[in-house]
Amino acid sequence: MGTVLGAMRNVRWHELQHAYGSASQVPGVLSRIAWGDAPTSDEALSDLERWIGTPPVFDSTAATVPFLWELAATDTVRDRAGVLDLLATILAAGNAEHPAWTRAAHDAVAAGRATAARLAAAPEAPEVPGAPVAPGSPDAPGAQAVRTAAARLLAAIDRHQYLACPACPAPPPRET
């Protein structure tokens, strides 16, 4: 698997659940998002959104989020904007029956704030007529969509307050 998604093997996916059962197939879906052709990647992202991103969140959601951040930051991933949108969906989702899952998922999304800020601030490359556009360059197809999705997610992270979040339980009181 190389360095991208290499840490997936450290997660006990078979012990986690998503909306339709065991999360054991999540690593394969993440791999298809990372390396699949456009139709394969799109289908995998759609599957993952149904499994972990639609309300409610599951125990596998928080385990998946760090890998979504990794994909969002990897220039060769085809739909990085879609990955960022899935992270925003997770931040807005919850599970009233399992508030710890909600908090873990929201914390995992918030932990990637620096990545969202970097992606949102990526400079636009100056236009050079006739110059080829390299994958991952600021003018590559989808680069503006990534900047826009990252800016939306960054704003959502900054607005997200656990006390105001209906999906999040109140944090424990701090001892003084």
Predicted regions and their residues:
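Arginine residue identity/basic-tract feature
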Residues: R9-R12, R32, R50, R78-R80, ...
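Positions within the helices of HEAT/ARM-like alpha-solenoid repeats
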Residues: P39-E43, S60, T64, R78-R80, ...
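Actinobacteria-biased recognition of intrinsically disordered, low-complexity terminal regions
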Residues: M1-S24, E127-P138, C165-T176
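Eukaryote-biased recognition of C-terminal alpha-helical segments
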Residues: V109-E124, G136-A164, P169-P172
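Alpha-helical solenoid scaffolds in large eukaryotic transport, assembly, and signaling factors
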Residues: G2, R9-T74, R80, L84-A96, ...
